[in-house]
């Protein structure tokens, strides 16, 4: 994937190697898609997945090193946040029965993260990650970490 990104965003060319890498990436994606139907996804696994999505943002994506050529890191942030938020939304009715305050805290933290991301919206997408100030990178990391803490407690619904 890195070679494809470099070819597209740094070298500005698509050569035989890029095409070969793209074909392999497509093949791998199709295999993954076929295997996904056979997985048994439990509520506990989904809840852990939501926390893992946030951890990925706060530990690796926030540095800007993942999308070093395309600088599309904010798209990845948003995708991870949306994934975690979808899982929260699915379990929110059950969580509200067990712990309304926790549910409200989670929603408040999602709103904060999304508001920070919205600062960098550009039409239907996002500005390059280089446009994000160091202060906002820290604020975003702090907001994601603040969201992860209550989100990790959502497993209360499986007890």
Region annotations inferred by a language model:
Residues 1-159:
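Mature extracytoplasmic or organellar-lumen-exposed domains after removal of signal/transit peptides
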């Amino acid at each position: 994937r890195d070679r494809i990104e470099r070819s597209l965003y740094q070298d500005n060319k698509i050569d035989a190697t890029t095409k070969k890498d793209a074909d392999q990436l497509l093949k791998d994606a199709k295999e993954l898609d076929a295997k996904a139907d056979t997985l048994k996804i439990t509520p506990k696994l989904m809840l852990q997945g939501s926390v893992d999505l946030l951890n990925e943002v706060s530990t690796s994506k926030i540095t800007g090193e993942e999308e070093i050529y395309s600088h599309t890191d904010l798209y990845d942030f948003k995708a991870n946040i949306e994934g975690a938020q979808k899982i929260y939304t699915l379990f929110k009715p059950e969580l509200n029965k067990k712990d309304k305050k926790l549910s409200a805290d989670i929603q408040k933290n999602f709103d904060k993260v999304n508001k920070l991301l919205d600062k960098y919206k550009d039409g239907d997408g996002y500005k390059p990650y280089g446009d994000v100030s160091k202060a906002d990178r820290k604020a975003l990391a702090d907001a994601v970490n603040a969201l992860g803490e209550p989100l990790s407690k959502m497993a209360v619904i499986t007890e």
